[in-house]
């Protein structure tokens, strides 16, 4: 080996000390996700290298990327000790989890998973697991991200994969369809098997719940009797006769049927778009005579500062999130109301926006979870943006949820890298009076004397070096543009 060859190999080799492995992928024998120099890679285990290289050579990976099923993935010539192959993934800017999705988003992810499984089946492949944590939303579009979940057909019991799909997709969707979205999202925090059959029956009508209970107990009893009277060998043969291996045609037919069933589930607000926002979404790039002063000021800030990423801390008025997205920013829009999130998600899909809408309250962002709270990163790390928009928010946080100015500013400041655009509401504003009438028996006179523009500005000055006042449309309201 000459000197030039050795130098080239050294350049391609990744120093182990510079690698940061992803904490949530410890149990995958096929490979491991890691970051290096800000980019996302996946090391492939030696026993899988030939198989995954073959997927590239056969054009399967390219096909899955072109159809929008799989996140962009490239084969590299990089080397890392302990791995036979290194892949590079396009990094999706905002990492979101199923417990923050609307019902329509979970359904989009379920249909993507089934479409991918159908495509894989035609190539003699399958997924070794089928749960929503394998999907990320790239703006408003779902993408499958777990490359090493793709394995040869028949390597994993199909029944186990299907059962996982039902518990992590079908059952939550049915729960949401019955109006229990908040409960479904809470249970989706369990990554593996979040919703068990008996948990789903809790939201059924009483008569249906009784039938489910009887059927479940009967099935358990039959299985128990079979285990006692039939030896293991004959029992395995009997299982093979009752549930013979699926042919390719039968597997495809089953997946197509499951897809039709999933598509038929009607989750709340699935196809809704707020009419006023639909009309306005087309004129957010260039000012028009119909714009109010607040829209003009926000548009001016977005066009002058050109933030690459924007977080909207409250998104009931979709105009501002849409404006940021159409001006070129990657946007994540938070709101505690699923209806608002579903409306914005539907609008984003229709307008092809790089905008991710999530069910989340800025007062209670999702924490880190899993081993050492590292398997799932906290929202404050995942959604930190160049700019935070805090419009139509302050009166509710202070006068409804009893936060003070320090708490409000700190909650917002932790999400921004550089700018915060906050709207201040004066005492006489109707929005303030809506939450805190002049005569409030619960609070003594003078309880909110600290609430003033000067007081808020002093708190903001502890976190930001410059604060600029901009006009809003209502009398006395002020937009405060804060910069670190």
Describe each region flagged by the PLM.
Residues 126, 131-179:
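Catalytic activation segment of kinase domains across protein kinase-like and atypical kinase folds
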Residues 306-316:
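Conserved class I S-adenosyl-L-methionine
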Residues 317-329:
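Conserved SAM-binding loop of SAM-dependent methyltransferases across substrates and taxa
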Residues 330-335:
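Conserved SAM-binding motif I beta-strand of class I
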Residues 343-382:
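S-adenosyl-L-methionine
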Residues 389:
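A conserved beta-strand element that flanks and buttresses the S-adenosyl-L-methionine
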Residues 396-411:
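A short, conserved alpha-helix within the catalytic core of class I
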Residues 411-427:
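Conserved beta-strand signature within the Rossmann-like core of class I S-adenosyl-L-methionine
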């Amino acid at each position: 080996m000459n000197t030039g060859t050795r130098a080239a190999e050294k350049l391609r080799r990744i120093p182990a000390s510079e690698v940061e492995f992803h904490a949530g992928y410890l149990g995958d024998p096929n490979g491991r996700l890691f970051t290096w120099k800000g980019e996302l890679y996946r090391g492939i285990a030696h026993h899988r290298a030939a198989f995954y290289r073959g997927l590239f050579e056969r054009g399967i990976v390219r096909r899955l990327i072109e159809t929008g099923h799989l996140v962009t993935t490239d084969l590299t010539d990089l080397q890392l000790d302990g791995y036979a192959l290194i892949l590079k993934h396009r990094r999706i800017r905002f990492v979101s989890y199923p417990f923050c999705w609307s019902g329509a988003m979970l359904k989009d992810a379920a249909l993507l998973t089934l479409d991918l499984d159908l495509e894989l089946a035609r190539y003699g492949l399958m997924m070794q697991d089928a749960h929503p944590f394998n999907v990320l939303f790239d703006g408003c579009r779902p993408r499958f991200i777990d490359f090493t979940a793709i394995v040869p057909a028949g390597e994993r019991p199909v029944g186990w994969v299907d059962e996982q799909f039902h518990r992590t997709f079908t059952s939550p969707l049915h729960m949401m369809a019955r109006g229990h979205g908040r409960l479904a999202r809470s249970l989706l925090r369990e990554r593996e098997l979040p919703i068990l059959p008996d948990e789903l029956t809790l939201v059924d009508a009483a008569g249906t719940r009784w039938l489910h209970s009887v059927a479940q107990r009967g099935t358990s009893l039959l299985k128990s009797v079979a285990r006692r009277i039939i030896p293991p060998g004959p029992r395995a043969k009997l299982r093979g006769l009752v549930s013979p291996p699926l042919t390719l045609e039968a597997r495809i037919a089953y997946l197509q049927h499951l897809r039709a069933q999933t598509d038929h589930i009607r989750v709340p607000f699935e196809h809704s778009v707020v009419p006023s926002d639909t009309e306005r979404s087309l004129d957010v790039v260039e000012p028009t005579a119909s714009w109010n002063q607040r829209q003009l000021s926000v548009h001016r800030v977005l066009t002058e500062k050109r933030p690459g990423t924007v977080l909207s801390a409250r998104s009931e008025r979709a105009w501002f999130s849409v404006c940021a997205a159409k001006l070129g920013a990657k946007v994540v829009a938070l709101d505690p109301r699923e209806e608002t999130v579903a409306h914005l998600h539907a609008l984003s899909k229709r307008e092809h926006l790089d905008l991710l809408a999530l069910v989340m309250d800025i007062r209670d962002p999702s924490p880190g979870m899993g081993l050492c709270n590292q398997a799932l990163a906290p929202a404050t790390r995942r959604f930190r943006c160049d700019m935070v928009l805090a419009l139509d928010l302050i009166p509710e946080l202070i006068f409804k949820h009893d936060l003070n100015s320090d708490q409000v500013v700190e909650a917002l400041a932790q999400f921004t890298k550089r700018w915060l655009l906050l709207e201040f509401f004066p005492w006489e504003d109707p929005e303030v009076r809506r939450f805190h009438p002049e005569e409030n028996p619960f609070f003594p006179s003078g309880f909110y004397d600290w609430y003033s523009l000067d007081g808020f500005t002093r708190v903001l000055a502890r976190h930001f070096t410059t604060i600029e006042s901009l006009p809003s449309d209502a009398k006395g309201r002020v937009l405060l543009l804060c910069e670190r």
